[in-house]
Regions:
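C-terminal, non-catalytic tails of nucleotide-sugar-dependent glycosyltransferases
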Residues: 215-241
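Nucleotide-sugar donor-binding/catalytic module of glycosyltransferases
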Residues: 1-211
Length: 241
């Protein structure tokens, strides 16, 4: 988990995570130089499984998450935002899927309604394709920002970390897509039908924000760069997945 000025909701999120963990599991939290009391709240939870790391200066969301991945030591790496909630049985379902896949992604529901997210092109229900084997089609949808691959709904095996790290420059704006692209090009990604995140909508994270044409164009350029790098890493035999 990467945190930044998340004092309002981070304690609730930590509780929803810790309730599903075993005693020898860990929660790696990297705080990106918050200016509020987020770090104090995390430290005050008093659970030995929570490992808090403080960045001395604000480096941005992707860099903080990369720092958290570098510190992860468990067999399975399960990602989390600071202000959502984990529904019950999330961890069990994702660990089961990781028995045969390197990366697993689930769906996202809106907290308080259990309704699915609305899509960027007017879809009333924005959900993952049931079959992730249609990789070219899914990659094309991802290039158009029309596949709901959220990092907070992802998990992967620890042997996938060498595939992802270090992040290329192109992934520092779209780290969620970077994970998905690598899972797709290697054919090792699984989709869960169930909701694995209860997403909290508030002013600081409003889903569905309209992007400018320039931002859309830049996103597609970054996608191409990430895809090329993922293919290069696969060709070089990087990682064991």
């Amino acid at each position: 988990m990467a945190t930044y000025n998340g004092s309002r909701y981070v304690a609730q999120q930590l509780t929803s995570i810790l309730d599903q963990l075993d005693e020898d599991d860990e929660v790696v939290v990297v705080d990106d130089a918050s200016s509020d009391d987020t770090r104090d709240i995390v430290a005050a939870c008093g659970d030995h499984r929570v490992q808090l790391h403080r960045l001395p200066v604000n480096r941005g969301y992707a860099a903080a998450f990369e720092a958290a991945l570098e510190r992860a030591s468990g067999e399975h790496v399960v990602l989390s935002d600071q202000d959502d909630l984990w529904p019950q049985e999330r961890l069990v379902a994702m660990q089961r899927a990781l028995g045969t896949a390197s990366v697993v992604v689930g769906n996202v529901a809106v907290l308080g309604t259990d309704a699915p997210l609305r899509g960027p092109f007017g879809q009333r229900e924005w959900r993952l394709p049931e079959d992730p084997s249609h990789r070219v089609r899914i990659l094309a949808g991802l290039a158009l920002s029309n596949v709901p691959y959220f990092g907070s709904a992802m998990a992967f095996r620890s042997d996938f970390l060498p595939v992802l790290l270090p992040y290329p420059a192109s992934a520092r704006e779209l780290p969620d897509a970077w994970i998905a692209i690598n899972g797709l090009v290697r054919g090792t990604i699984a989709h869960l039908e169930q909701d694995v995140v209860l997403h909290r909508l508030h002013g600081a994270n409003a889903t569905g924000t309209i992007r400018s044409p320039r931002a859309v164009l830049r996103g597609r350029l970054l996608f191409v760069q990430m895809l090329r790098e993922a293919l290069r890493r696969r060709g070089s035999g990087r990682g064991s997945s």
